[in-house]
């Protein structure tokens, strides 16, 4: 009998009933909510006369609609209604939350790990497609729809069919200037946005082992762009060191670690599909089109038109085959989002822009992903570095990742963005998004166009 993967072990721990290959009832350890996908679910509870079964296992954040200049100046009626309704709902149903304007407020996928609620071995859901971020800690974590949010509210359970298992092994040593964002963008560019459909993706290998938790979260965050709603990594000493001392970790932390160590995938675990990628061969990645698979490394020209999707993408983006990333005339820079708005991301960008000025006629904003990150960054002077360079230093929130708040890229303008999606109109009507690492975005802010960060002395 072959060994088990970490996913197998976690799945088995959480099955309540049901046969393999059929929908199985799973117990949910942690339910994260935010203002966009929860209002109808709460109303469904009211209509049925139900309560939240485990408010102690539920945690709310305010992030998608929050303005980042004056956080309380919410002018869009729908956004204000969603913010106000969540504030009412968490009080009515007794749910702890990082309230709007509080010292813990931030993007849900940052607040969970920061507070220690995200822990190895947990089964985590949230009404948000980037919930796979939490898989970096050795959890089953994925996004759910609003009707499922209501089901979890009422029962603390969810019906799920166990997916197939894919192993993605990152090997080798990266060149300087290559980061975990490049790993995941390169994977998606090579294998496509549908490769992970129907699979849980386990990321491992020597290149993963060397990453910090913040870098690991970047990879798991974009599992959904690879087609998989779940990404997972094995917990290790890096995981435990990150978690130790955080607010919500188990009181007997050493005992918890002893249990978490048993979750690691067995050496003889079997997978339905295996992909290996040598990161030593990677160059900085930039997307040129309108889905995350439409990306190239800095050294490679944009591809020839292969199908109608390429043709439409080139038309929308105002680009053509044979051009290169350095040819893109950028107008906006966005450093933020649940993909790359952690302290280490901001430190990396600050090293590159320190003592320099952003290119004329370019707008550049930095949005810390949470208030704790903002405070930590300001404590070491990152805010001053960015502001001296000409960046706008904002309050925490989802910001320009998506057009659901005042932060939008103008129609027709190209934006270098550290976020996770480059769909048409994602950052605002007519916005042209180019996904990249924080280093690439910061360097582009200074030059006005993409440059090869491998050649910069500030890059390690």
UniProtKB/Swiss-Prot annotation:
It is an enzyme of class 4 (lyase). GO terms for molecular function: 3-isopropylmalate dehydratase activity; 4 iron, 4 sulfur cluster binding; metal ion binding. Its EC number is 4.2.1.33. Gene3D superfamilies: Aconitase, domain 3 (3.30.499.10). Pathway: Amino-acid biosynthesis; L-leucine biosynthesis; L-leucine from 3-methyl-2-oxobutanoate: step 2/4. Keywords: 4Fe-4S, Amino-acid biosynthesis, Branched-chain amino acid biosynthesis, Iron, Iron-sulfur, Leucine biosynthesis, Lyase, Metal-binding. The keyword 4Fe-4S applies. CDD domains: IPMI. It catalyses: (2R,3S)-3-isopropylmalate = (2S)-2-isopropylmalate. GO terms for biological process: L-leucine biosynthetic process. Heterodimer of LeuC and LeuD. This is 3-isopropylmalate dehydratase large subunit.
